[in-house]
UniProtKB/Swiss-Prot annotation:
Heme b b562 binds at residues 83, 182. PROSITE patterns: CYTB_CTER, CYTB_NTER. It comes from Petromyscus collinus (Pygmy rock mouse). The gene is MT-CYB. A ubiquinone binds at residue 201. One of its GO terms (cellular component) is mitochondrial inner membrane. Keywords: Electron transport, Heme, Iron, Membrane, Metal-binding, Mitochondrion, Mitochondrion inner membrane, Respiratory chain, Transmembrane, Transmembrane helix, Transport, Ubiquinone. GO terms for biological process: mitochondrial electron transport, ubiquinol to cytochrome c. This is Cytochrome b.
Length: 379
C-alpha cells in the first residue's frame, strides 16, 4: 500500500497534498479553517443537491416548494436548515480564514492570496443568488435592490440590469437563471479551491512567527489530520446547536412572507454576512460612488501584498500594527451592526465614519505603522 500511495498517479497527488505534505511544526489552530472551509463546501453541495431534487424555480411555486421540503420531505426541514445555516458557518470560517491571512502575513503568497479573494467573490455571489431562491419578501426585494445597483454603471447600466433580470423587473426568468447559476457555481468554487491548494503547496504553509519554516517541518498525517479533526468536531457541534435549537436566528422573518412586488418591506437588508459591505455602500450618498466603494471593500484585500512595508511578515512581533488590526476587526463589527439599522440619524454618520476608518486603516495607517516599526527595530 505504501508503494501504491507513492507511485499511483492519482494516489500520489492525494499523498503529496494530505499525507506526506511537509508542514511547519508551529502552525496553530488558526490554520484549521482551510479544512473547515472544505467541509463547508462539501456539506453545502450535498445538502443543496437534495434540496434541488424537490425545489422548483418558478415564481408561482418556489415559495410553496420550500414549504413542501420542510413539511412533507423526510428530514427536509433538517436539510433546508443545514443548508441555510451552513452558509452562515461558511462565511464565519471564511472571515476568520482571511483575518488569519492578514494577521500572519499569509498574503505574501500572492497567487494563493489572489485566488482566495476570487473564491471569496464567488462564494458571495453564490450566497446572494441562493438567498433569492426561497422567493420570500426579502429574497425578492434583496434581488431587486442589489441587481439594480448595476444601473449605476455609465452608458450600459440599465441595459445590463435588464439583461440580468431577463425582462423589465425581477421575475420568473431571473429566478430560473439564479437557480442555474447557484447550482453550477459551487463546482467552479471547488475547482478554484483546488487551484488555491496547488499554489499553496508550491510555497508551503506560512506559520505564526512569519519566519522561514523549512528548518522544522513534520508530515501532515497524522499530526495535522488529528488536529483538524478536533476543529471539525467543534464545527459540527456549533452547527448542530444552531440548526437544531435556533435555525432562524441568523435569518430574516420577512422571508417567511411570499414575495409581493406591490408591497415593499420597511427595511430591506441582505443576510448578516453582507451587512458590512452594505453599510459601506449606504454610507456614500452617490449611487455610482456607493457601488464602487462596495466592490473596493473586498477588492482592497488584493492590495495587501503591495502595501506591506514591514521587514517582518507576521504581526506577532509588531504591537502597533497589531493594535490597528484589532481596531479594524471592531470597525467591521460596527459596520455589520450599522448595515442592519435603518437609514436615519445617528446610524448614517456612524456608518460613514466607520467606512472612512476601514479604508484609512488598510490604505494609510497599516503601511505607516510598518515603517515606524522598521525604525524601532534599529534602535
Amino acid at each position: 500500500m505504501t508503494n501504491m500511495r507513492k507511485s499511483h498517479p492519482l494516489f500520489k497527488i492525494i499523498n503529496h497534498s494530505f499525507i506526506d505534505l511537509p508542514t511547519p511544526s508551529s502552525i496553530s489552530s488558526w490554520w484549521n479553517f482551510g479544512s473547515l472551509l472544505g467541509i463547508c463546501l462539501v456539506l453545502q453541495i450535498l445538502t443543496g443537491l437534495f434540496l434541488a431534487m424537490h425545489y422548483t424555480s418558478d415564481t408561482m411555486t418556489a415559495f410553496s416548494s420550500v414549504t413542501h421540503i420542510c413539511r412533507d420531505v423526510n428530514y427536509g426541514w433538517l436539510i433546508r436548515y443545514m443548508h441555510a445555516n451552513g452558509a452562515s458557518m461558511f462565511f464565519i470560517c471564511l472571515f476568520l480564514h482571511v483575518g488569519r491571512g492578514i494577521y500572519y502575513g499569509s498574503y505574501m503568497f500572492t497567487e494563493t492570496w489572489n485566488i482566495g479573494i476570487i473564491l471569496l467573490f464567488a462564494v458571495m455571489a453564490t450566497a446572494f443568488m441562493g438567498y433569492v431562491l426561497p422567493w420570500g419578501q426579502m429574497s425578492f426585494w434583496g434581488a431587486t435592490v442589489i441587481t439594480n445597483l448595476l444601473s449605476a454603471i455609465p452608458y450600459i447600466g440599465t441595459m445590463l440590469v435588464e439583461w440580468i433580470w431577463g425582462g423589465f423587473s425581477v421575475d420568473k426568468a431571473t429566478l430560473t437563471r439564479f437557480f442555474a447559476f447557484h447550482f453550477i457555481l459551487p463546482f467552479i468554487i471547488t475547482a478554484l479551491a483546488m487551484v488555491h491548494l496547488l499554489f499553496l503547496h508550491e510555497t508551503g504553509s506560512n506559520n505564526p512567527s512569519g519566519l522561514d519554516p523549512n528548518a522544522d517541518k513534520i508530515p501532515f498525517h497524522p499530526y495535522y489530520t488529528i488536529k483538524d479533526t478536533l476543529g471539525v468536531l467543534i464545527f459540527i457541534t456549533v452547527m448542530l446547536v444552531l440548526v437544531l435549537f435556533s435555525p432562524d436566528l441568523l435569518g430574516d422573518p420577512d422571508n417567511y412572507t411570499p414575495a409581493n412586488p406591490l408591497n415593499t418591506p420597511p427595511h430591506i437588508k441582505p443576510e448578516w454576512y453582507f451587512l458590512f459591505a452594505y453599510a459601506i455602500l449606504r454610507s456614500i450618498p452617490n449611487k455610482l460612488g456607493g457601488v464602487m466603494a462596495l466592490v473596493l471593500s473586498i477588492l482592497i484585500l488584493m492590495l495587501f501584498p503591495l502595501l506591506h512595508t514591514s521587514k517582518q511578515r507576521s504581526l506577532m512581533f509588531r504591537p502597533i500594527t497589531q493594535t490597528l488590526f484589532w481596531i479594524l476587526v471592531v470597525d467591521l463589527l460596527i459596520l455589520t451592526w450599522i448595515g442592519g439599522q435603518p437609514v436615519e440619524h445617528p446610524f448614517i454618520i456612524i456608518g460613514q465614519l466607520a467606512s472612512i476608518l476601514y479604508f484609512s486603516i488598510i490604505l494609510i495607517f497599516m503601511p505607516i505603522s510598518g515603517l515606524i516599526e522598521n525604525k524601532i527595530l534599529k534602535i
